[in-house]
Amino acid sequence: MDKTDQTAIDESALVLNRTEKSAEAVLRVASMALSITGLVIMIKNSISNEFGSVSYSNIGAFMYLVSANGVCAAYSLLSALAILALPCPISKVQVRTLFLLDQVVTYVVLAAGAVSAETVYLAYYGNIPITWSSACDSYGSFCHNALISVVFTFVVSLLYMLLSLISSYRLFTRFEAP
């Protein structure tokens, strides 16, 4: 192989690395935007009627959802900037750190979505054996907005599952096991 062939291989690896970094940054920015959307919908979600008033701050699961979406949005922004700013090639410590933090954010957001989905389910359908009736008959728009926020949160968790796969692939294919 002559020097020209080696240069072509190095340049194609650099382009692939830039493409990989750009795609990952786009996924992180998209998850940030969706997290903020879910967070804003839930924060603005309140209703008052003859039965009383309710807002997200009255329900622990929804407060956790707002917190998890806020943490995810902040981490998504910081990690997208870090991905774009990291030198090529990135070190093993940087790859492991991204992998670990991606895993943590994935599970935090997934847990927030799951507990909030259970709360929304109970609000829509109640629990007949213990005589809980549906709350959404009285607070329809609140339930609808909560459901939309939960859907956004699950989409974010899917994006973070994909990002976790990318970071695990990067870690386990490019570096030896610890």
Curated annotation (Swiss-Prot):
Keywords: Cell membrane, Membrane, Transmembrane, Transmembrane helix. The chain crosses the membrane at residues 23-43, 70-90, 97-117, 146-166. The keyword Transmembrane helix applies. GO terms for cellular component: plasma membrane. It comes from the Eukaryota. It is found in: Cell membrane. Coiled coil: none annotated. It is a multi-pass membrane protein. Pfam families: CASP_dom. GO terms for biological process: floral organ abscission. Belongs to the Casparian strip membrane proteins (CASP) family. Involved in floral organ shedding. This is CASP-like protein 2A2. It comes from Arabidopsis thaliana.
